[in-house]
UniProtKB/Swiss-Prot annotation:
Cystine pairings recorded for this chain: none
Protein name: ATP synthase subunit alpha
Subcellular location: Cell membrane
Catalytic activity reported: ATP + H2O + 4 H(+)(in) = ADP + phosphate + 5 H(+)(out)
Classification lineage: Bacteria, Bacillati, Bacillota, Bacilli, Lactobacillales
A GO molecular function held by the record: ADP binding
This protein's UniProt keywords: ATP synthesis, ATP-binding, Cell membrane, CF(1), Hydrogen ion transport, Ion transport, Membrane, Nucleotide-binding, Translocase, Transport
Residues marked Required for activity (site): S362
KW Nucleus (keyword) present: no
Primary localization class, coarse: membrane
Length: 505
């Protein structure tokens, strides 16, 4: 077989014509320091703030400090495999997390990686962790109620869809319980819930996930967990990752409830990062931009205008206080950013008033706009009555000679406190809340012993469901209070048959 020279030259020419030179330019730097979740690198002169960088072992980091000689990088993951002298390269991308329906029912870390052992998350959608909050014209005023199922909140400090309501109190006063009960109450409410656990013990998060699963709430919930053993950057990033996951649903016209449990630990993680990055410390050693850290997060919660689909994201940030001191730096910051706060009192909690909500210092700046008309009517004077009872109660301790009007107020106040108590993980429907609050404010409980109030309430609900179901149906469907004569007749009929316990006071 003879090889022709012309064929060879033609083949070479063809190969040369088809050859495409690919020049792949990567800007790289050298790690000069690593430790405590932070790295410094020299040589990345064109790196951008917030840009994602890749280390030689595949771990990613985010540019946080831009200095004259080097860049400060927060490491997103385990930094044990990163050493001085390692190569780090720019990616040209910003920090993103996976989003979409595939995350619902899953437990993930702030990078969107699964923690529940159920395999990879099947989604190709991602969103930037940092995103600009909706502007004034992109928003709509909060008008739809978000029912928490907790009487004391829905009646006294109502929350609306798109609101930011701070839950504040000392440790072990029931903050997380309020969040879990609120999530449980969103069943069949067309709401997607995101629970962001920041610095919570992994055993605690496991317990919360099991509770949500037991009550069927994981069918519409995403859990984002950054445990206390994680590096500080993961704790700092967790709420932003949760917000990005929520925005995907909000901008698609859906309604989202996001719980940040809690922002005190995120602030501590950010303080740690900033001090290691040698940023100048301010009050309580927090960096100067700690207010902006929280404001840019919480401003992402909104009720969107109809032009943008009318979706909403409601935020319930938690802040832990020390000995009830709400004048500390982080509590005052977050109070000024949010649309109200629910203050939990340790003394109330220890005395058995649970949820331990202090009606005097709790407020919702959205107010009655976030209540159905029926609830607005029955709960109108409740807050004032409770505040005057607390005041009278403290004075009544010093003297026994009280006139009948004062004694009646104290008796009604004790029954009000008892009605607002609620067992763990038993959120109430809004129609049942309206029924019991109507009975309270119209004097039907005045002759019921305080110890029997909870039994009276439970039996009243059963009685109404069996004999006067049309009343609760009307409240649920029309959001209005039914005819008061019918309400009075139904409750009076039940009260006449109710048998108090002999030992009850």
């Amino acid at each position: 077989m003879s090889i022709k020279a012309e064929e060879i030259s033609a083949l070479i020419k063809q190969q040369l014509e088809n050859y495409q030179a690919e020049l792949n330019v990567e800007e790289t730097g050298t790690v000069t320091y690593v430790g405590d979740g932070i790295a410094r690198a020299h040589g990345l002169n064109n790196a951008l703030s917030g840009e994602l960088l890749e280390f030689s072992n595949g771990v990613f980091g985010m540019v946080q400090n831009l200095e004259s000689n080097d860049v400060g990088i927060v490491i997103m993951g385990n930094y044990d495999g990163i050493h001085e002298g390692d190569v780090v390269k720019r990616t040209g991308r910003i920090m993103e997390v996976p989003v979409g329906d595939a995350l619902i029912g899953r437990v993930v870390n702030p990078l969107g990686e699964p923690l529940d052992g159920k395999g990879a998350i099947q989604t190709t959608k991602t969103r930037p962790v940092e995103n600009k909050a909706p502007g004034v014209m992109q928003r709509k005023s909060v008008e739809q109620p978000l029912q928490t199922g907790i009487k004391a909140i829905d009646a006294l400090v109502p929350i609306g869809r798109g609101q930011r309501e701070l839950i504040i109190g000392d440790r072990k006063t029931g903050k997380t319980t309020i969040a879990i009960d609120t999530i449980l109450n969103q069943k069949d409410q067309d709401m997607i819930c995101i629970y962001v656990a920041i610095g919570q013990k992994e055993s605690t998060v496991r317990t919360q996930v099991e509770t949500l699963r037991r009550y069927g709430a994981m069918d519409y919930t995403i859990v984002v967990s950054a445990g206390p053993s994680e590096p500080a950057p993961m704790l700092y990033l967790a709420p932003y990752a949760g917000a990005a996951m929520g925005e995907e649903f909000m901008y698609n016209g859906k309604h989202v409830l996001i719980v940040y449990d809690d922002l005190s630990k995120q602030a501590d993680a950010y303080r740690e990062l900033s001090l290691i990055l040698r940023r100048p410390p301010g009050r309580e050693a927090y960096p100067g931009d700690i207010f902006y850290t929280h404001s840019r997060l919480l401003e992402r919660a909104a009720k969107l205008s109809d032009d943008l689909g009318g979706g909403s994201m409601t935020a319930l940030p938690f802040v832990e206080t020390k000995a009830g001191d709400v004048s500390a730096y982080i509590p005052t910051n977050v109070i000024s950013i949010t649309d109200g706060q629910v203050f939990l009192d340790g003394d109330y909690f220890n005395s058995g008033t649970r949820p331990a909500i202090d009606a005097g210092t709790s407020v919702s700046r959205v107010g009655g706009d976030a209540q159905i008309k029926a609830m607005k009517k029955v709960a109108g004077t409740l807050r004032l009555d409770l505040a005057s009872y607390r005041e009278l109660e403290s004075f009544a301790q010093f003297g026994s000679d009280l006139d009948k009007a004062t004694q009646a107020k104290l008796a009604r106040g004790r029954r009000t406190v008892e009605v607002l108590k609620q067992p763990l993980h038993q959120p109430l429907s809004v129609e049942n809340q309206v029924m019991i609050l109507y009975a309270l404010t119209h004097g039907f409980l005045d002759n019921v012993p305080v110890d029997d109030i909870q039994r009276f309430q439970d039996e009243l609900f059963d009685y109404i469901a069996s004999n006067n179901k049309e009343l609760t149906d009307e409240i649920r469907e029309t959001k209005q209070l039914p005819d008061t004569d019918k309400m009075d007749a139904a409750i009076k009929s039940f009260a006449e048959h109710f048998q108090p316990t002999k030992e009850a006071k």
